Amino acid sequence: MNIELLQQLCEASAVSGDEQEVRDILINTLEPCVNEITFDGLGSFVARKGNKGPKVAVVGHMDEVGFMVTHIDESGFLRFTTIGGWWNQSMLNHRVTIRTHKGVKIPGVIGSVAPHALTEKQKQQPLSFDEMFIDIGANSREEVEKRGVEIGNFISPEANFACWGEDKVVGKALDNRIGCAMMAELLQTVNNPEITLYGVGSVEEEVGLRGAQTSAEHIKPDVVIVLDTAVAGDVPGIDNIKYPLKLGQGPGLMLFDKRYFPNQKLVAALKSCAAHNDLPLQFSTMKTGATDGGRYNVMGGGRPVVALCLPTRYLHANSGMISKADYEALLTLIRGFLTTLTAEKVNAFSQFRQVD
């Protein structure tokens, strides 16, 4: 696990629609070891390694959930809208970073009312998004604008990357910088002359899987492995039957989500690879969300796709948590699978005629 790369990626500000910082990190990381780097029309990062055999894509979306400045009042407070899925109770009094159009980062905090000034009824009611504001310590609109903050600036949670104990990693934007980091490690270490390997950092996943569609059209892959996160149900307050994934028990294979079913032969091949290498593997479903697999699997008449996810606590909030052991297990699983992949195996994934 390249913890330095993961930290660099997590500390980048790259809300959906503003992924340049992550794109730059991936360019600098992978340019020395790939044949070509290109981009689709929305800005998804595409690295190619090799030029022979079937096209195999490993995809991790670059964007994170965040906010955008929508109004600056006369007193210097900012109003904002959410980008991606947020729960309002996870937002109050958290520090944020505003990225100006020139790339300057301005710190702020989502303001909260002191309990002394709240009625008992108000204390029992969650604050709506429309009532929230951001304080950057300015005294007027003019001071805000002098610092370079404008309507339309993107806002991300403040970076807070850390390792806790021997196994846990905590930080913002683990969804889905872990996918980007793992994609990069695979491009650096997998050498299989039988396939053309693509590493994709897709854009705008959190607002509709948009970069998945455009990058799929750009590459036209034969097989796709999507890397993402999934809800860990091993904390108080979560139904662990609906959300069975646990940290430290291995990566999760997504059996279906709102927009995708995996190719069953691809699932069987990965399960066999995990068993052969004595790697733990969990299984999950997601009825209310989707991964980039939901766009890749229907492109060009349909493609074999599977989504593999790291169990993650506290998704779509300021601080998520993953297990290093789960990361290593998933990296080992995919590396082993890609290393032994051949054109014959790839073709077999799309053969649907029953053979006696």
Swiss-Prot record:
Cofactor annotation remark: Binds 2 divalent metal cations per subunit.
S-S bridge residues: none
Chain sites annotated for binding a divalent metal cation 2: D175, E206, H316
Protease as UniProt keyword: yes
Required cofactor names: a divalent metal cation
UniProt keyword Hydrolase, yes or no: yes
Enzyme class: hydrolase
Xref: InterPro entries: Peptidase_M42, Peptidase_M42_aminopept, Peptidase_M42_dom2
Keywords for this protein: Aminopeptidase, Hydrolase, Metal-binding, Metalloprotease, Protease
Residues that bind a divalent metal cation 1: H61, D175, D228
Gene Ontology MF term list: metal ion binding; metalloaminopeptidase activity
Enzyme Commission number: 3.4.11.-
Active-site residue list: E205 (proton acceptor)
GO biological process, one term: proteolysis
Domain of life: Bacteria
Family the UniProt entry places it in: Belongs to the peptidase M42 family.
PANTHER family: AMINOPEPTIDASE, AMINOPEPTIDASE YPDE-RELATED
Protein name: Putative aminopeptidase FrvX
Species: Escherichia coli (strain K12)
Gene: frvX
